[in-house]
Swiss-Prot record:
Residues 353-589 form the ABC transporter domain. Residues 38-321 form the ABC transmembrane type-1 domain. Homodimer. It holds the Pfam family ABC_tran. Its main location: membrane. Involved in lipopolysaccharide (LPS) biosynthesis. Translocates lipid A-core from the inner to the outer leaflet of the inner membrane. Transmembrane domains (TMD) form a pore in the inner membrane and the ATP-binding domain (NBD) is responsible for energy generation. It comes from Burkholderia mallei (strain ATCC 23344). It catalyses: ATP + H2O + lipid A-core oligosaccharideSide 1 = ADP + phosphate + lipid A-core oligosaccharideSide 2. GO terms for molecular function: ABC-type oligopeptide transporter activity; ATP binding; ATP hydrolysis activity; ATPase-coupled lipid transmembrane transporter activity. This is ATP-dependent lipid A-core flippase. Keywords: ATP-binding, Cell inner membrane, Cell membrane, Lipid transport, Membrane, Nucleotide-binding, Translocase, Transmembrane, Transmembrane helix, Transport. It is found in: Cell inner membrane.
Amino acid sequence: MSVKPTLSKPIGGQDASSPAVVMRRLWPYVKPLVWVLVAGVLAMAAVAATEAGIPALLKPLLDHGFGSKGDMTTKLYVPAAVVGLALARAIAQYASGYLLQYVSNRILLDLRIQMFERMIHTGVSFFQRETASTVINAVVFEVNQVLSVLMGVTITLVRDSLTVVFLLGYLFYLNWRLTLIVAILLPCIGWLVGKINRRLRRLNREHQTLTNQLAYIVEETVGGYKVVKVHNGEPYEIGRFNELSRKLRGYSMRMTVSGGLAQPLTQFLASIALAVVLTIAVVQSANDQTTVGGFVAFVTAMLLIISPLKHLMDVNQPLQRGMTAAELIFGLIDEPREPEGGGKPLARASGAIEFSHVSFSYGMSRDGRQTLDDVSFTVAPGEMVALAGPSGSGKTTLVNLLPRFFDPSSGSVRVDGVALPEYSLRDLRNQIAMVSQDVVLFNDTIAANVAYGQAPERDRVEAALRAANLWETVTAMPDGIDTLVGDNGMRLSGGQRQRLAIARAIYKDAPILILDEATSALDSESERHVQAALETLMKGRTTLVIAHRLSTIERADRILVLEGGKIVESGSHRELLEQGGLYAHLHRIQFQQDAG
């Protein structure tokens, strides 16, 4: 069942976002640049004014400059005025383009930075709720859509509206009777073009959807090429690719048919308008009511007005696309931040941990059962406690409460006798190192990965790598600790990736360690190196470990056995085996698997 993304939501608590609401949200970003924006708009107004200048120069030239008896002054000043007008237009056009792009790029920078900062400071529940592609799309791509509304619609409304106003004003000045006729016919042209454009927009959306589906098929086939080949899936993949390609071709042809109608029909209706104007103009000229120059200037201005009118009619499409993008962007910006905590400083904890009647639920299940239910235990400084139990018993949820990825629904978690919310969140997390079975490495150097979150000190990096039994491997690499590990450490083996994650925890030197042991199979040599690195890491630290290896469980000072969100057994390895309960059952199953 598909789940509707929660990141995109109407802005300002409305049922649907409106341009006015979006502009109010954008105003704080625009305000520091308002005078730059005003200058850009004025430059656009100058560009619009020059549109009416061209037909205005044709009239005196045709009326007074042509023929042997033409006025010499008119013959000289009109060409000079054309050059001057073109120069003024070019300068104004460049100025408006530069100034508006300056505003656009500055707002883009501010929005992206704020979005990334908010994303990185949201709670863990946000990352569990939203897909990575949704967040990436919002931060990287959708910002451009909002700025397309801000700049594109602004340019269209200002430049083309002013162009229409100037040209209509000039038309009324030349001949108000003919202008009234044009004013009646032009909306008909606009209605027809708008209807064709609506169909084109729908076809474009469907075409884009099919294009994305086609790209996804290629991506799936390339990424899963081994499965495709082993299962002889080539005919299936070729079949669905060909089917979608044929659909795509059909939509392309329908777009060609619809798009091809727009220009001929527009030209046909414009020709009707022109024929009506010509007829009336001939009648008026017979009665000496118009001149050749006035007629040519009128027709030129009439033809020039069609393009900006079309742009104004098409403004709704980018506007609606921008509204959708704005909902995604401000949905991210409005996400609540993680709680900062009470601000109590914590330089270095002794490592004492206490869970007191802790309950937690991600959302009540149908039977009303919670993920953790009234869990209580203490861990002494330097003690190693292993968490065991079947899948879904609450082990990972329990350790996630310690760095405050989540807060308990009831009860409290304490470090050194102080409830976690009282500590500064940054100071609290400085006390905790975490090594997960899902190793996360960044596309950076080995040194940067080891010292992640801190400035790399080469001596400390070397010491951490030695302690993790990885130093000899690193020194054999061409660039040593400056070697790039690739996307999530793809240039390293599985065992090397795990040891690099352990080296990162050693470098942090936190008094509390959370260890989720890897279940992935390693060769015996890698297993030996990883086990030795873990022993070094756990030495002298308070350790909570979600144990998968028998050797780790047996070495723990105490084992807590969870089932259904409750601690059902507690004791040492030997004590729990003697009890013959759930732990003994799990141990027997794993021992048989290991023996097998």
